[in-house]
Amino acid sequence: MSYPMHWGEWILNFRVPPAGVFGVAFLARVALVFYGVFQDRTLLVRYTDIDYHVFTDAARFVTEGRSPYLRATYRYTPLLSWLLTPNVYLSELFGKFLFISCDLLTAFLLYRLLLLKGLGRRQACGYCVFWLLNPLPMAVSSRGNADSIVASLVLSTLYFIEKRLIACAAVFYGFAVHMKMYPVTYILPIALHLRPERDDDERLRQARFSFQARLYDFLRRLCSWAVLLFVAVAGLTFVALSFGFYYKYGWEFLEHTYFYHLTRRDIRHNFSPYFYMLYLTAESKWSFTLGIAAFLPQFILLSAASFAYYRDLVFCCFLHTSIFVTFNKVCTSQYFLWYLCLLPLVMPLVRMPWKRAVVLLLFWFIGQALWLAPAYVLEFQGKNTFLFIWLAGLFFLLINCSILIQIISHYKEDRLTERIKYD
């Protein structure tokens, strides 16, 4: 009797030289950057992301000694505008090359992490193909989206945790949270992962203790040296960046970098299941309360995932990001990159038949297509299709939840993911 081949065995059937794959991925991204120049000059629909022009304008204000927040709709850390000042001094393409470089750095970190997990070079590179030759990250970074920077910071954090360099990991984590708010959800699984684990005999003795005693023991182990070091260094990094930019730019830095994203209620159509509710209640006195209440499902699911899967930190962070994006108040296509950059690390431990994986992938694209159809009619024909967009968003939510359930049910924790002692 033959068993269905899972995607790990399917990848092993290919001989993938790492240098060749990275070279092709680099050339493809460079070609897309220059194609974007051509399309921007010749076609009505521009290739370059509108946010890239916002970044460049903000960088221009920085070069003039003024605030980047003089540019309307700039809702990012000033650090990004500082990094893109060569857009003004050298070439407007500098930022795109920076983003595709971070894109490739993300792939390299994926490769190194897979090697640390015990995979061979050929198999590790085979999994990296799902990022290197994925058209979505290729298009997003070459269009001028900065999410590849955050992806590389998140992967750097996980890499240095695996290498047991806790202080280095904490520095990168502090930068990641400063650049984007979503990695802050990783702090609980990271802390649980770094705390010392009890042996079997200690577990048996602990089971006879009261709830208060078990809670005290849990908190005591949570205050281990590794956890305290990580929290202290990450906190100092984040606070130092925030204090420095607050000193220079004042309240507008806090408002546009942090508070805007915490209280954001985007009533424009997007993939979020909440958008239609927020759209209909935009003028209601309950609008703000409903927006805050939307965090509750995220909080419950993220907490459950943390305690269930913290031993495999990479898998736990993948679940965290997928849950955060799926149940967020705002969800656009670029948000998918937040968890797709972790998918190659998860794939070796998800023993799923490749045919089922292909079916799930097709459903994922079908869900987006069903949403894009009424969204196109709304944007370009001006017809009221909000209800259909919302229903398509609910269907896409169902698809994403089904995919997550399938990934969890086929997840097999390997011996390669055994706990590392940090103390």
Swiss-Prot record:
Pfam families xrefs: Mannosyl_trans (PF05007)
EC main group: transferase
Topological region Cytoplasmic: 1-17, 111-169, 246-287, 351-357, 406-423
Pathway the protein contributes to: Glycolipid biosynthesis; glycosylphosphatidylinositol-anchor biosynthesis
Alphabetized UniProt keyword annotations: Endoplasmic reticulum, Glycosyltransferase, GPI-anchor biosynthesis, Membrane, Transferase, Transmembrane, Transmembrane helix
Predominant location: endoplasmic reticulum
Family, as annotated: Belongs to the PIGM family.
Membrane-topology annotation of the record: Multi-pass membrane protein
Biological processes annotated in GO: GPI anchor biosynthetic process
Function: Catalytic subunit of the glycosylphosphatidylinositol-mannosyltransferase I complex which catalyzes the transfer of the first mannose, via an alpha-1,4 bond from a dolichol-phosphate-mannose (Dol-P-Man) to the glucosaminyl acyl phosphatidylinositol (GlcN-(acyl)PI) intermediate to generate alpha-D-Man-(1->4)-alpha-D-GlcN-(1->6)-(1-radyl,2-acyl-sn-glycero-3-phospho)-2-acyl-inositol and participates in the sixth step of the glycosylphosphatidylinositol-anchor biosynthesis.
EC nos: 2.4.1.-
Spans within the Lumenal topological domain: 39-89, 191-224, 309-329, 379-384
Cited InterPro entries: PIG-M
Gene Ontology molecular function, alphabetical: glycolipid 1,4-alpha-mannosyltransferase activity
Descriptive protein name: GPI alpha-1,4-mannosyltransferase I, catalytic subunit
GO CC annotation: endoplasmic reticulum membrane; glycosylphosphatidylinositol-mannosyltransferase I complex
Subcellular location per the Swiss-Prot or TrEMBL entry: Endoplasmic reticulum membrane
Subunit architecture: Part of the glycosylphosphatidylinositol-mannosyltransferase I complex that is composed of PIGM and PIGX. Interacts with PIGX; PIGX stabilizes PIGM.
Transmembrane segments: 18-38, 90-110, 170-190, 225-245, 288-308, 330-350, 358-378, 385-405
Organism, as annotated: Mus musculus
